Amino acid sequence: MKSSVEQLSDTRVKITVEVPFEELKPELDQAYAALAQQVQIPGFRKGKAPRQLIDARFGRGPVLEQVVNDMLPTRYGQAIEENDIKAIGQPDVEITKIEDNEVVEFTAEVDVRPEITLPDFSAINVEVPAVTVDDAAVDEELESLRARFSTLKDHNHKLKKGEFVTLNLSASVDGEKVEEATTEGLSYEIGSGDLIDGLDEALLGQKKDDTVEFTTELANGDYQGKEAVVTAEITATKQRELPALDDEFAQLASEFDTMEELRESTKTQVETRLKNEQAANIRDEVLKAALESSDFALPNSIVEEQAHSQLHQLLGELAHDDAALNSVLESQGTTREEFEKQNREDAEKAVRTQLFLDVLAETEEPEVSQQELTDHILFTAQSYGMDPNQFIGQLQQSGQIANLFADVRRGKALAQAICRVNVKDSEGNEIDPKDYFGEEEVAEDSNDEAADQE
């Protein structure tokens, strides 16, 4: 077999392959054996008919067609390997010559990974927000915990932001009742803004048993975009009652006996969360700087595939209803054109990041242990809300375990490179990235990096 490569662009090549017939004996034998099973010729057992009779019955064409179909995957793969081509995606194959008993020739155009020059990570400088755990941050966390143990108590004063009401809602457009906007016994927190535009303003200052009326533009449904008259009947009013921050609360809300112990534990939790955020900031800033210093062309077909995949995933969340997507975009003040542009930019970023990390992984050559791969699989299953055993079964069936292995390898490669970067916080303090991305922290960072790519 002979092969040659023509560079069509930075990201696409054309491979020409010539295969002499003497190399196709296994495929010829297999083709005749398959056809022999399809014909019954008097005097011969099934599958034992000689080739001359098969040619007479079917002609030589079906044999050659089967030979070509059988040999294409292996010969294409051989040409890719021999020419050290980093192919991406599926090739466009064309059979250019079939000379019986002489040669088969085909061409394959395929996208390839562009040449990527990695930066000197030791020359990269990044700055991230400083980690400051003050009393205010701890108080905020404790207030959040306190709110989770609050109770709702009836009241009859004028409504304020943050208080709760029970409503009977109805709406009409041009005097016609809007059924989908009619409900009873709806609980709502004033100020949340997650129901109907104008509702919060209408409720403020009202009391139990009051009825308010206001106009608003409906955001969805059959009357989307129409001006509607909304009537809200207030059937109950409640306010949040918070427990005191004392030892009794500490025992109720945690495993601690005293408020002092709970406060100290909360401070540790806040510090851990802020440090995790700082680690993520370091990773993001380093990756951003590295990508900016390593410009390279992107295979258009791969970007298109990524953009299509992103759109398909989003539509899947909307029952593949294109009209529903347009409605969501309109409610967000975004046009379809703006969405498609942003989707394309996101796809380019995703493809650029993965190609860069693939090259980085080949350079850094991190080792991935079975435990690290298992941890990542469990992490991914959890992020999808799936049973781990069921998820692993799906991975094995679809042959996707290698992809998750590559995810971990990319994450570890980036972690190794980050350890050479110069990092300071916003207060000018030097940060040793090994504290976050050293050997012990790499597996967890690999999970985070893989999750960000999905």
Swiss-Prot record:
Primary localization: cytoplasm
Residues in coiled coil: none
Reactions accelerated catalytically: [protein]-peptidylproline (omega=180) = [protein]-peptidylproline (omega=0)
GO CC annotations, alphabetized: cytoplasm
InterPro entries per record: PPIase_dom_sf, PPIase_FKBP_dom, Trig_fac, Trigger_fac_C, Trigger_fac_C_sf, Trigger_fac_ribosome-bd_bac, Trigger_fac_ribosome-bd_sf, Trigger_fact/SurA_dom_sf
Subcellular location: Cytoplasm
A biological process term (GO) from this entry: protein transport
Feature: compositional bias, Acidic residues: 438-454
Annotated region described as Disordered, given as residue ranges: 427-454
Ranges where the PPIase FKBP-type domain occurs: 162-243
Enzyme class: isomerase
Cited Pfam families: FKBP_C, Trigger_C, Trigger_N
GO MF assignments: peptidyl-prolyl cis-trans isomerase activity; protein folding chaperone; ribosome binding
Domain of life, per lineage: Bacteria
Compositionally skewed regions (Basic and acidic residues) per UniProt: 427-437
Keyword vocabulary terms for this entry: Cell cycle, Cell division, Chaperone, Cytoplasm, Isomerase, Rotamase
EC number(s) per entry: 5.2.1.8
Family label: Belongs to the FKBP-type PPIase family. Tig subfamily.
Function text: Involved in protein export. Acts as a chaperone by maintaining the newly synthesized protein in an open conformation. Functions as a peptidyl-prolyl cis-trans isomerase.
UniProt note: domains: Consists of 3 domains; the N-terminus binds the ribosome, the middle domain has PPIase activity, while the C-terminus has intrinsic chaperone activity on its own.
NCBIfam families found in the cross-reference section: tig
Protein name: Trigger factor
Gene name tied to this protein: tig
